[in-house]
Amino acid sequence: MSEQRQESLQNNPNLSKKDVKIVEKILSKNDIKAAEMKERYLKEGLYVLNFMSSPGSGKTTMLENLADFKDFKFCVVEGDLQTNRDADRLRKKGVSAHQITTGEACHLEASMIEGAFDLLKDEGALEKSDFLIIENVGNLVCPSSYNLGAAMNIVLLSVPEGDDKVLKYPTMFMCADAVIISKADMVEVFNFRVSQVKEDMQKLKPEAPIFLMSSKDPKSLEDFKNFLLEKKRENYQSTHSF
């Protein structure tokens, strides 16, 4: 757990000392498992991406479209509170996907990923993939606290959500190794200020690239796909401390 996270917990007026110790124990246990999973990812030769966003930002649609690229081979761990709908959508595109239903939990944890990882391995999906993509539970708060051992943490912000979210949810955007502004074809409809997002990201994480993406603009997806392939070639590993 990062010093910043620990200090934030200890200074939270809504948490008793007992509560703080419980939360610290949970997060520390998750960090240990995340480190173990990272070793397993590397052993399998997988480059792991953790996609986070609000519900309905377009994560699954983006993955469906990525499946059309012959040079981008991946399998997926899906996280949702209920239903297998997203995993089913991806399977129809020929993508090996395992659904994790969390019930009431608003995030995925490293121990949850382990079970899905083992199932994908048993199915032979890992050896056919260059990337393992984790589509986290739709939420701009909880997932940013849980390390999954990913090489990159990528945050989507959809245009209909508004351009003010970066500083409203700083913990999420501080962990981003890249930001996608999705549904970018609706920028004018919603008076969405891309410049505001860029300005706010300069304050939080200036090194994180920002991509404008729309399902109506195939080149925007191809540019992002090429970016991911390059990061894999570089073996870029996120330095963010959860």
UniProtKB/Swiss-Prot annotation:
Regulation: Metal coordination and the nucleotide-bound state of HypB directly influence each other. Binding of nickel in the G-domain decreases GTPase activity and modulates the oligomeric state of the protein. Binding of zinc inhibits the GTPase activity. GTP and GDP modulate coordination, stoichiometry, and affinity of nickel, but not zinc. Potassium increases the GTPase activity but has no effect on the other biochemical properties of the protein.
Binding-site list for Ni(2+): C106, H107, C142
Effect caused by changing K168A: Abolishes GTP-dependent dimerization, but does not affect nickel-dependent dimerization. Loss of GTPase activity
Keyword Disulfide bond: no
Family of the protein in this entry: Belongs to the SIMIBI class G3E GTPase family. HypB/HupM subfamily.
The keyword Nucleotide-binding is annotated on this UniProt entry: yes
GO BP field: protein maturation
Effect of F190V: Strong decrease in GTP-dependent dimerization, but does not affect nickel-dependent dimerization
Knockout mutant characteristics: Mutant has negligible hydrogenase activity and is severely impaired in urease activity.
Chain spans, region G-domain: 48-211
MF term (GO), any: GTP binding
The protein's assembly and partners: Monomer and homodimer. Dimerization is induced by nickel, but not by zinc. Dimerization is also induced by GTP. Forms complexes with HypA.
Task performed by this protein: Involved in the maturation of [NiFe] hydrogenases. Required for nickel insertion into the metal center of the hydrogenase. Is also required for maturation of urease. Exhibits a low intrinsic GTPase activity, which is essential for nickel insertion.
Keywords: GTP-binding, Hydrolase, Metal-binding, Nickel, Nucleotide-binding, Zinc
Pfam families: cobW
Domain of life, per lineage: Bacteria
Xref: InterPro entries: CobW/HypB/UreG_nucleotide-bd, Hyd_mat_HypB, P-loop_NTPase
Protein name: Hydrogenase/urease maturation factor HypB
Positions bound to Zn(2+): C106, C142
Entry remark concerning the domains of this protein: Contains a metal-binding site, which can bind nickel or zinc, with a higher affinity for zinc. His-107 is an essential nickel ligand only in the nucleotide-free state of the protein.
